[in-house]
Structures are given as C-alpha cells and as structure tokens.
Amino acid sequence: MRIRLPARCGGPARSGTPARAPSRRTARRALPAVVALTLLVPMYACRAVPTPPSAPTPWPAGYAHRWQWQWQLTGPVDTTVEADVFLLDPVRTTSAETAELRRRDRRLVCQVHVGSYADTDPDATRFPAAVRGVATDRPRRHWLDVRRWDVLRPVLADRFRLCRGKGFGAVALADADGYAHRSGFPLHFDDQLRFNRRVATLARSLELSPGLVDDLDQVAALAPDFDFAVNEECVRLHRCAKLLPFTEAHKPVFHVEYTGTTATFCVTTVGYGFASMRKQRDLGPWRDPCPLP
C-alpha cells in the first residue's frame, strides 16, 4: 500500500537560504526514522489537503453507514444532491460537473463495464469479433471473453484513464460476473477471479480505487482485492449477508433497492452497515435514501 502524504503541514514555508540536500549515505540512515515519525504523527495535526484529481479515493474505515450516496447514469447530472459519494457514467459526465462536485468535497466514482460492451460505446470497435459474446439482459450490450486479457487490458486502461482525467478517484467495475451467465464463452469461476483481480490491479496502477459491483458469489474471495462494493437488491434477493466480508473489513458497501420502501429495507441494510437507498431502475437523479443511524 502506498501512503500519500501532504507536501507540508501548517503554514507557508519560511523564506531564507535553502537547506543543503543531505548526502546519499545520510539520507539512507535517516529514512527509517522519518518513516517511523510519519506513522506516529497524528493525521489531525495537519491541515486537510484536497485530494488531487489523480489520487485514489480514500475510504475512512467504518464510515459508510454514515454516508449518503448517489448513483446516476441517466439524465443531466444533479450536482446539488446532498450526498457524500457520487457514482456516475464517465463518458456522459463532463469535466465541469466533476469539478463542481469536487469543489463541494464529494467523492467521485466512475462506473466502467469491464466484462461487457455496448454497441453505442465510443470504443466498441476496439473489441474484435473473437472476444464478443452473446447479449446480456440489457439492450445492445454483449458479454466479453474475459480470458483474453491481452485484448481487453489496453481498452480498459483507456477507460480508466478517462475516469482519472475527469477527476474521478475510484472506479466501480460492472459486469464482472460473466462466468455466472450465458456469455457465449466457457468461462469458469477461476477465470473470472483471475480477470477481476487483474482489473483491480490495473485500476490501482492508474491511481483509481477499485470497487466490485454485485458478483456476490465471489465476494468472499475478492474482498481483499477491492476497496468497496456496490450492490443491487440484496434485500429482495435475500443475499445481503454475502457482503459481510466487506463490512467486516471496514470497507464501504453502497447498496440500492428498486422495489419496496425504505421503511421496510433500511432496518436490514443499515443494520449491516451499508450506505443504502431506493432508486428507480433507470438510475436517474431521483433517490430515496435511508436515514442515517
């Protein structure tokens, strides 16, 4: 794990003659002491430093159940929504919108389909016929052969770079469960595990915090590799306990239900420690969040 430290704490640097750089031998001897001191100094002793656009989103341990979140993939982005975390489409969302959200200290997550492509995707032609599978349950979207990392990696890397360039600090990996569907390829559990871990590693290499969307049957194996989870309808499907590896590791779980009322499901999801809300299936701006505990 890399620890990002602010360039300085407190007020502006003093003027005067610059200090002479230490010799290489002195620097080597001083390094252990500097590291120890860094780990011992309380972080609240420093002034808050805004996270730069290319830095991974930090997820404070155990705070998710006290957060509100928004998941919007259709319609004009409503930047006025009172939410701490925004999950958005990186293609449709403009840099001006992400800049406004960052100005309001919101945490930004882009959604990237890593195991599928749509005919309307700007980069759809980059996927050769050999990796294009059968249709998913959504119009004009098809599964990909996730065993072909050599083909998928460069396309996914560019999708992640788009997120980073627009100021997102995290990425939610959607359609990461093709093995559990009729994808058109003989995908197995281990094929999917290998791919999902590779994608998480790729996201980190491009300074994005990786999150897993659904794929509940692999959560126990993948929770150590991901920083957060996004789930749809675990209450309706009676599968919320599958997400405990994330909450027990003090990692956020962002949850949504499309049916029922918050009065009926919030007791369950907030009890699990999820950040939870009700949405319509088109994932427009409307939301009905669970009350904070």
Segments and roles (model prediction):
Residues 13-15:
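Interdomain coupling and dimerization elements in large ATP-driven molecular machines
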Residues 50-293:
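Glycan-processing catalytic domains of CAZymes
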Residues 1-7, 17, 22-50:
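Secretory targeting and sorting signals
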